[in-house]
């Protein structure tokens, strides 16, 4: 499923435009599975699956697989419908240079919501 993130995000011109000043690599952990996602000027250029020995990323988003499953459901329940709600419930850990994450929060919310069963934005 994560493999489709590149085509889903890059296929949304409005989302790419929103992230036009964003160039970074971040780590997404879904339970024991890890993914390095590289973004250049709002376009996802690579989605690489782990495991990684020493991953180089600006920041990391880590949550159990069951929490991501709820987040990516067609109609996520309250508390699982938004990245900040997951952080507030302390099930999503955001670590590293959070300035990049917070400055582009809407981009990351919409990009990760593209993996929902219906592909809707956040």
Label the predicted regions:
Residues 1-122:
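Feature captures hydrophobic
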């Amino acid at each position: 499923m994560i493999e489709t993130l590149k085509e889903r995000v890059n296929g949304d011109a409005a989302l790419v435009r929103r992230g036009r000043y964003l160039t970074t690599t971040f780590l997404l952990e879904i339970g024991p599975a890890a993914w390095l996602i590289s973004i250049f000027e709002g376009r996802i250029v690579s989605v690489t699956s782990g495991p990684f020995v020493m991953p180089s990323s600006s920041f990391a988003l880590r949550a159990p697989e069951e929490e991501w499953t709820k987040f990516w459901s067609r109609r996520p329940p309250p508390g699982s419908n938004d990245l900040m709600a997951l952080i507030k419930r302390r099930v999503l850990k955001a670590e590293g240079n959070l300035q990049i994450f917070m400055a582009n929060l809407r981009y990351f919310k919409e990009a990760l919501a593209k993996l929902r069963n219906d592909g809707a934005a956040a």
